[in-house]
Amino acid sequence: MFKCPERVSIKKKEDILDLPNLVEVQIKSYKQFLQIGKLAEERENIGLEEVFREIFPIKSYNEATILEYLSYNLGVPKYSPEECIRRGITYSVTLKVRFRLTDETGIKEEEVYMGTIPIMTDKGTFIINGAERVVVSQVHRSPGINFEQEKHSKGNVLFSFRIIPYRGSWLEASFDINDLIYIHIDRKKRRRKILAMTFIRALGYSTDADIIEEFFAVEEHSLRSEKDFVALVGKVLADNVVDADSSLVYGKAGEKLSTAMLKRILDAGVQSLKIAVGADENHPIIKMLAKDPTDSYEAALKDFYRRLRPGEPATLANARSTIMRLFFDSKRYNLGRVGRYKLNKKLGFPLDDETLSQVTLRKEDVIGALKYLIRLRMGDEKTSIDDIDHLANRRVRSVGELIQNHCRSGLARMEKIVRERMNLFDFSSDTLTPGKIISAKGLVSVLKDFFSRSQLSQFMDQTNPVAELTHKRRLSALGPGGLNRERAGFEVRDVHSSHYGRICPIETPEGPNIGLITSLSSFAKINEFGFIETPYRVVRDGIVTDEIEYMTADVEEDCVIAQASAELDEYNMFKDSVCWARYKGEAFEADTSTVTHMDVSPKQLVSVVTGLIPFLEHDDANRALMGSNMQRQAVPLLKTEAAIVGTGLEGRAAKDSGAIVVAQEDGVVEYVDSYEIVVAKKNNPTLKDTYPLKKFLRSNSGTCINQTPLCSVGDVVTHGDVLADGPATDKGELALGKNVLVAFMPWYGYNFEDAIIISEKLIKQDAYTSIYIEEFELTARDTKLGKEEITRDIPNVSEEVLANLGEDGIVRIGAEVKPGDILVGKITPKSETELAPEERLLRAIFGEKAADVKDASLTVPPGTEGVVMDVKVFSRKDRLSKSDDELVEEAVHLKDLQKEYKSQLAQLKMEHREKLGALLLNEKAPAAIIHRRSADILVQEGAVFDQETIELLERESLVDLLMAPCDMYDVLKDILSNYETAVQRLEVNYKTEAEHIKEGDADLDHGVIRQVKVYVASKRKLQVGDKMAGRHGNKGVVSKIVPEADMPFLANGETVQMILNPLGVPSRMNLGQVLETHLGYAAKTAGIYVKTPVFEGFPESRIWDMMIEQGLPEDGKSYLFDGKTGERFDSKVVVGYIYMLKLSHLIADKIHARSIGPYSLVTQQPLGGKAQMGGQRFGEMEVWALEAYGVAHMLQEILTVKSDDVSGRTRIYESIVKGENLLRSGTPESFNVLIKEMQGLGLDVRPMVVDA
């Protein structure tokens, strides 16, 4: 069996932590959303379950009818993912929901079909209408509370806060220039500001005394004589001072005490006063109390309502329901667990599960936020403003959450329909059941819309395995509820210190999306709140332990974190007394005794793709960015070859991308061919795992997916071993390009501007040859004029052209085709009205059949050549047009199918009985087993299981059994659940097969009788104009393919395979390519593979030592000889092995020519672009160039007859046919368009004859 090449490394010890599963982000999120495989009562209140519980129960307006949700049940997929791609359909399961309806007639329960839900493949993708798609995770501003500051034009700093819910109205509060706090509700309505004091009263703090008590500590002071005045003058009252007998008010809460006031109070016989500690007349709360126009709860509510809804009558009931709806109704306002967590953390409230489940706003939250805001204004050191670009304030919405939000809106639509149907239902004529009032359309259409149209549901980039993997790990700040690329500023796009180990600082696209689309770092995970976590080793008492702690960005702020490269002694203690560390996002030299944590690996900073670049630490960041992005564009080659110089991540990237086949369990290989591998399990050799291999499938980007086995019969395999290679992999390692012998030197000017010169030897060896597969599709429909027909009998086509078509009119597999060749012959009925009267007469006389159909065949488009490698035909069977023989044959097939189904079902039952027997027979029941519905005790606690009891359990379904939690119940649950799923799958397969025998391919689109798909494979060799690149952002275009004899050669006669321009290195500052060249040469000569992980790679000295060991020049430079003259070049040249990739920008796809073609309807000018068979625009600047030369006739020809002079075009055609050399140009059509536009503006422009 092939093993991955053992790579040599200078790394002293391996990483303490292995990389997590790289597509876990997708799989885990969707698993939580659907909770497949869990019993209804075991499901947690998350995902789809949460949405149903939120929307239901639905009550009618009079509350006489109630519809409750009980549970949902997911079916099994009808076809495999590969079959769905082949048929062009969605990989999904049925969703059935059990409802309970209570009305005046009684209680009814029913399971209602609610449509289908797309499910994720085990690679983390969805198949929608036959195309693989990925739902990208979205980074958005976290719900919660944010404190901000802005500078006023007068120079004052104004503080504010914002409470952002997950769903609902935003609540903002900000200081104004007079130190008063105003509340804004919803940003769109900024002008409607409400004084914070009014809002506090509207929340239920009615009197001034209540409000003061909330914000200040209250002390009681005695007032016996005038001696006490000194301590009290200037203090603020916390409560009204009232004469008990006459109810006369001597002082109001919030008033400042003066000597006169104190004298009056003393005279009235009041003996004690309540004083607000720390309050003075400049305190914002005291200022607002004075400013507040309201003085009671009712008045405040009405004032609040008036400002929010000016012009509407402000009644108490209206006002109360408005404020309740805005912030205290969980259907309209929801902070979410995340929002509640962030808010409680910031304001110092408890973080236990009970408080986190409180999703609406509380009065305490508003008071707490205002207190914090005032402390911030007063300059309290314990308060701080928030940085909105910090990852503590940005969270990730993964697939599950995005789909959950869409399901919520779909079910909310359905809720309205259900309510209306409840009200309009006529109980006298019919009985009401859940199925009659529930419409599944809302949910289905919302899901369909999300998967096919959402900005975050993207067609998967499948150029190579790395592109696939990166796409699933991508984070986007765009999309609904996110940012807009036009409005996103520099700060959002920039690298932030909190990104360390969470978001890769390098991998992001160039162009308008820079910084908005990023990638998860290699070790990063997403926690339950959606925040990105990264792992660190815990340091205790100066000892670096092997304990791993995953930390979010806000927790990390309080830790001192050492780098992974810090040296440790044999006791895992720091060797030096100081080391480089990070604290609050700043790097500094820290005393090792203060260090609390340590990085797990130097590569935790970067993403997987960036981690595949060797000597990344020697490359400029801009070039590393290009290198990361270009690896994703590398085309899988016909002959793959692993890189000599790797980073050690190649195997892991290939495994997690799903490109290769990996053993799921230990076992022995029993059978191998190019289509499947069968492995007998180690613990039970009678059970076998079958691994089907993908053969010559077309990827989303047209490249070829092909898996080849690496194992042989009899090989012993363990879990995780590579069984088969896939596209762009070599022995289980990623292999995107080729190791090529390169020289950095100029060569006759051909490598000017980064161009690349290659040897013809690479072409002969098929080194950079790749296979592309094109899919062409043709459908025959039932039209108004009759059925379209797929046939070989096409009117007015010679037999020569039809040579490659079979009898059924479809091209034979293996035929070589070129542009214009017919792939599938099709004729379409033609409308009678198209005929001229004389033609109709001729047809009536001669009865010509060919004239009533037109040729609508599928032909090869321009620019495509290749070999037909596969043909797929899907057709519907018409029940009525079947002959007797066909009906008999169908019956025989169905009988055989039923027989096969029954035998497989019997086999399943037998295996199920054996498993139950192995688990239970003669064992004691650790707990009683009870029937859930009838409440009968099936097995008593302590009873011994006999064969009869086992048979009894065998007949029951898992849903109906109840048992106290124990190990036996867990295994029993697994056995019953697996059996039920297997039976369900068998049943679906049987029904699908039977349907296929009776009706053919019933899932074809409406009106389609037959569908043919033809796959054409073309072999693309490397040619001049193709784009190539290394892994360091060193890209270029092939400028010349030189005969091997003319290439420069080394002293030993070996010719160089590729020449690169040395001027491409100094200004680009990507020295990694030079180091890779040297190390590659040394490793190739030694016959070894090396790995140089990012930030801990081979030092220069070690490379020179290896060069000397292999007898290579120690400076890495060699003398080369000119292949043309045989003379030695003057200077020494850097020669070595570098890993070069061929990118998917192939010249064959870009080159294009037009002789005749379509014209734009309005301007009558040729269209633009290859897809439209367009022309090359001769623009304004090109016209200037011709004007500069004074070539008037040429200019006139280009601007008229070659473009949009309609009549002139016809005339020039005639003159060419007649052989005349004549140009009579007319008016360009675009001139007429200009005149019409001016007339449209009311300017009467027309030619006029003026007498001279």
From Swiss-Prot:
It catalyses: RNA(n) + a ribonucleoside 5'-triphosphate = RNA(n+1) + diphosphate. Its EC number is 2.7.7.6. GO terms for biological process: DNA-templated transcription. It is an enzyme of class 2 (transferase). One of its GO terms (cellular component) is DNA-directed RNA polymerase complex. SUPFAM superfamilies: beta and beta-prime subunits of DNA dependent RNA-polymerase. Keywords: DNA-directed RNA polymerase, Nucleotidyltransferase, Transcription, Transferase. GO terms for molecular function: DNA binding; DNA-directed RNA polymerase activity; ribonucleoside binding. It holds the Pfam family RNA_pol_Rpb2_1. It comes from the Bacteria. The RNAP catalytic core consists of 2 alpha, 1 beta, 1 beta' and 1 omega subunit. When a sigma factor is associated with the core the holoenzyme is formed, which can initiate transcription. Belongs to the RNA polymerase beta chain family. DNA-dependent RNA polymerase catalyzes the transcription of DNA into RNA using the four ribonucleoside triphosphates as substrates. This is DNA-directed RNA polymerase subunit beta. It comes from Chlamydia muridarum (strain MoPn / Nigg). The gene is rpoB.
